[in-house]
UniProtKB/Swiss-Prot annotation:
Record keywords, A-Z: ATP-binding, Ligase, Nucleotide-binding, Purine biosynthesis
A Gene Ontology BP annotation from the UniProt entry: cobalamin biosynthetic process
Name assigned to this protein: Phosphoribosylaminoimidazole-succinocarboxamide synthase
Catalysed reaction equations from the record: 5-amino-1-(5-phospho-D-ribosyl)imidazole-4-carboxylate + L-aspartate + ATP = (2S)-2-[5-amino-1-(5-phospho-beta-D-ribosyl)imidazole-4-carboxamido]succinate + ADP + phosphate + 2 H(+)
E.C. numbers: 6.3.2.6
Pfam families: SAICAR_synt
GO molecular function: ATP binding; phosphoribosylaminoimidazolesuccinocarboxamide synthase activity
SUPFAM superfamilies according to UniProt: SAICAR synthase-like
Top EC class of this enzyme: ligase
Record family assignment: Belongs to the SAICAR synthetase family.
Pathway in which this enzyme or protein is active: Purine metabolism; IMP biosynthesis via de novo pathway; 5-amino-1-(5-phospho-D-ribosyl)imidazole-4-carboxamide from 5-amino-1-(5-phospho-D-ribosyl)imidazole-4-carboxylate: step 1/2
Gene: purC
Cleaved signal peptide residues: none
Alphabetized Gene3D superfamilies for the sequence: ATP-grasp fold, B domain (3.30.470.20), Phosphorylase Kinase, domain 1 (3.30.200.20)
Length: 236
């Protein structure tokens, strides 16, 4: 497979065309961003760690019936992925209240929610990725119909039901995470983007130490060490 020109660069990855019009190469970057890229940094080796973590998680999900865009991992930082039309919604799944949720609703930080909360944000940096509801999704034509909203929520909850016990077994609490979904040329809804400490909140099961991008957001230090610890636990 030939890697051709880059046609998209996001906060954490670059996408390159290939000699197959249905396949892309996704390259993980060392860049760190927070607060809609108002805060920026760089952590050497982060791209390698996120690529390895996301590869392991996507393989786990595929084994459990979740369709993903991943075809294969071809280097320490590169994956071959199916070309998708990305649904312009960030899907957030919350098991424990923290972050923006406690600011918006006044819930005590660390409160375990009675069930997994699924929220949507509009993917629009200029607007600050605002929270939206089902009706917004329909009015803005972000989804095809109400049935697709249900499909998205069901997939999000199924992913959470697979990952929560998996990480618990690794002595990690999956506090919350965000996913992006895409539609393939066959109109199949698939998990795209990545699942990594960039997109998840992981707390140590016993100490509640943060092992994710909050270490960068909150200037806690040792970002790379936290990502390395997550990978080590996943592989053990």
């Amino acid at each position: 497979m030939t890697k051709k020109e880059m046609f998209y660069e996001g906060k954490g990855k670059k996408l390159f065309k290939t000699d197959d019009e249905n396949l892309l190469i996704s390259e993980f970057k060392d860049d760190l961003t927070a607060f809609n890229a108002e805060k920026r940094g760089n952590e050497s080796g982060k791209g390698v760690l996120n690529c390895k973590i996301s590869t392991e998680i996507f393989h786990l999900l595929e084994k459990n019936g979740i369709k993903t865009h991943l075809v294969e991992t071809i280097s320490d930082t590169e994956q071959v992925v199916k070309k998708c039309k990305i649904v312009p919604i960030e899907v957030i799944i919350r098991n424990v209240a923290t972050g923006s949720l406690i600011k918006r609703l006044g819930i005590k930080d660390g409160t375990v929610l009675p069930f997994a909360l699924v929220e949507f944000c509009l993917k629009d940096d200029a607007l600050g990725d605002p929270f939206i509801n089902d009706e917004h999704c329909l009015i803005l034509n972000l989804v095809q119909n109400e049935a697709q909203i249900s499909e998205i929520k069901n997939m999000a909850r199924k992913i959470n039901s697979i990952l929560t016990p998996f990480f618990d077994n690794k002595n990690l609490r999956l506090i919350d995470f965000k996913i992006e979904l895409g539609l393939t040329k066959d109109n199949d809804l698939v998990l795209a983007d990545e699942i990594s400490p960039d997109s998840c909140r992981f707390w140590d099961k016993f100490s509640n130490e943060k092992l994710d991008k909050d270490r960068f957001r909150q200037d806690l230090g040792n970002v790379k060490m936290a990502y390395e610890e997550v990978l080590k636990r996943i592989l053990n």
